[in-house]
A protein has these predicted regions:
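A generic structural signal for ordered secondary structure
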Residues: 181, 289, 306-314
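Detector for the N-terminal beta1/A-loop initiation region of ABC nucleotide-binding domains
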Residues: 278
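Short, non-ligating residues that shape and space the ligands of small metal-coordination modules
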Residues: 281-282, 313-317
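Compact Cys/His-rich metal-coordination microdomains
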Residues: 302-303, 316
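Short cysteine-rich clusters marking metal-coordination/redox-active sites
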Residues: 272-275, 305-308
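Metal-cofactor-dependent catalytic cores
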Residues: 1-271, 282-285, 321
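Short linker/helix segments within small regulatory modules
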Residues: 287-302
Length: 321
C-alpha cells in the first residue's frame, strides 16, 4: 500500500528544503509555510508591501540561478532566524524578521548569483505563497516513478530535484497520473488530485552541488513524449499528515501515461531554455492570442513565455537532439 515517506517545505523560494515529520493542512490552503519568502529580481515591479503571486521568471530561482543549490539554508519558522552554510561551514546567520537581516540575505544572494547586478528584493507573502503555479496547490512525487526512470536512463536521480511537498512510496510507477480528477486520502486528510506537474529546467540542477548534470525535461520528452513528473493536490480537509501514513488511492483502470516515442513539433518551433515550453509556428499560442501560422519572428519583442514568464530572447530554435 502506498505510504508517505517524506514531507518538505521550502520557506524561501529557490533555497533549501526543510524536512518535517508531520504537518497540518487546511482545506483550500497551500502547504504550510512553503515558499512564503521569495527574492524578487531587481528589475521587476513586485510590490514589497503587498506582494502577490507572479511567474517564476520574476524571482531568483533554480531554473535560472543554479548557484542557489551550492549553499544550504535553514529558517526557524518560529523566530525567522536563518542560517546559511556551505559544505557544513557556517557562512551567515541572520534574522528575517528585521530589515538588517533581510538586507544581509539580499546582499549575500547578489554576491552568490553572477547574473545579478543589484541586490534582489526579499518579499514575504501575506496570505499565499510563491510556488510556480498560482493556485493553492501542494506537490506530490511518487518515488517508484523516479526509480523507474533511473533504471531506464541508467542515472541516479535525487528526488529532491523535484522540490515536492509530499513524497510517497510503494505506489505503482506513474500511477499518480491515473488519480488526476479524483480524490485520495493521506492519513486523515483528503486531497483532490488537480493536475500533472510539468517540469522545468530547475530539475536539471543537482541539489547536492548546484551543477546542471542532467536534462530532466528533455529526457522526459524524448522518452515519454511529455515533460510531466508528479502531480498537484488541493487539500479538501483540515487534518494532520505524517510520515508513515498510508495513502488510499482510487480504483482506476490503467491508462497510457507515456508515448513510446516523442512526437516532434514542426520544423519551425522554438523552445524556452528555462521551462522547455515549445512555441510551434504551425500551432501558434492560444493563451497569448497568437494565431496558428504566426512566425516566431513576427511575435512582438515584449512577448513573454506563457509558462514561466521569460522574455522572447530566452527562446532558441528547437531541435530534438
Amino acid at each position: 500500500m502506498p505510504i508517505v515517506s517524506g514531507l518538505y517545505r521550502f520557506p524561501v523560494k529557490g533555497l533549501s528544503p526543510q524536512s518535517m515529520s508531520s504537518v497540518t493542512v487546511a482545506a483550500g490552503q497551500p502547504f504550510p509555510m512553503d515558499r512564503i519568502f521569495a527574492l524578487a529580481r531587481p528589475d521587476t515591479s513586485i510590490n514589497s508591501k503587498n506582494p502577490i503571486w507572479a511567474k517564476k521568471s520574476k524571482f531568483v530561482m533554480l531554473m535560472a540561478d543554479q548557484q542557489l543549490a551550492e549553499v544550504q539554508t535553514e529558517v526557524d519558522l518560529d523566530t525567522l532566524e536563518m542560517t546559511i552554510k556551505k559544505n557544513n561551514e557556517l557562512l551567515l546567520k541572520l534574522d528575517l524578521a528585521n530589515q538588517s537581516g533581510q538586507m544581509a540575505l539580499e546582499s549575500f544572494i547578489q554576491n552568490l548569483i553572477p547574473s545579478l547586478n543589484q541586490n534582489p528584493n526579499l518579499v514575504q507573502s501575506l496570505d499565499g505563497h510563491f510556488m510556480d503555479k498560482p493556485g493553492n496547490l501542494i506537490s506530490l512525487i511518487n518515488l517508484e516513478t523516479i526509480r523507474m526512470i533511473e533504471k531506464k536512463w541508467d542515472a541516479k536521480i535525487n528526488p529532491l530535484r523535484f522540490r515536492a511537498n509530499i513524497y510517497i512510496d510503494n505506489a505503482e510507477p506513474w500511477s499518480e497520473f491515473n488519480w488526476v480528477g479524483k480524490d485520495i486520502s493521506v492519513g486523515g486528510a483528503v486531497f483532490y488530485v488537480d493536475s500533472r506537474n510539468s517540469r522545468c529546467g530547475a530539475t536539471n540542477v543537482n541539489p547536492e552541488n548546484g551543477k546542471r548534470d542532467l536534462n530532466i525535461p528533455g529526457s522526459l520528452r524524448r522518452t515519454f513524449g511529455h515533460k510531466d513528473l508528479g502531480v498537484y493536490l488541493v487539500a479538501k480537509s483540515n487534518a494532520c499528515v505524517s510520515i508513515g501514513d498510508y495513502v488510499n488511492i482510487p480504483d482506476t483502470p490503467t491508462i497510457v501515461i507515456a508515448q513510446s516515442s516523442f512526437q516532434e513539433p514542426s520544423l519551425n518551433s522554438f523552445i524556452c531554455q528555462g521551462c522547455y515550453f515549445i512555441y510551434d509556428e504551425k500551432v501558434g499560442c492560444a493563451f497569448s492570442g497568437i494565431k496558428p501560422g504566426t512566425k516566431f519572428g513576427e511575435i512582438q519583442k515584449s512577448w513573454l513565455c506563457p509558462d514561466c514568464g521569460a522574455n522572447k530572447l530566452s527562446f532558441e530554435k528547437f531541435h530534438l537532439n
